Amino acid sequence: MVQDMKDYNVEPENITLSMDTLDKKILELLSVDGRKSYRKISRDLGVSVGTIHNRVDKLTKSGIINKFVPVIDHEKLGYHLTAIIGLEIKGGTVAHLIEKEPFKNNLLAVYDVTGQFDGILIAKFKNTFELNKFIKQLLQEDNVTRTYTQTVLNIVKEELNSSMIDFEE
């Protein structure tokens, strides 16, 4: 999910949507297998297929479900290097980077943060040459004053979906 930060001086509306037990169970099942058919979900939960369809439609229209996407194994595509990149930014935000051609293909996550850095990027690369080129291009950005890069030695856990969130509150 990308938050529009065109005017970062305006506080975004903080809306918490409510879900009942059935909605939560549907989300749990879809978090494990996003391709699971409505028919199988309806059997698992003991409700009609129409009910599942209507609930998923409601969850999608309300923005709780943003999209259905595959979970990609980047290693199998040749992206063996994961980098965590801290950015010092001179005014503004890191949000503009996600649309720029040299950056958008490698970025998995972009965060505005507090602390030592103004932004954190998580990116994947095929090799150190690609990472080096990426960093050099970042430093050519007018508002990027410094980068601090850490390469990941071992991925212990990497799930960029919400399957581990406790829906049972």
Predicted region positions:
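A compositional/biophysical signature of low hydrophobicity enriched in polar/charged and small residues
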Residues: M1-E169
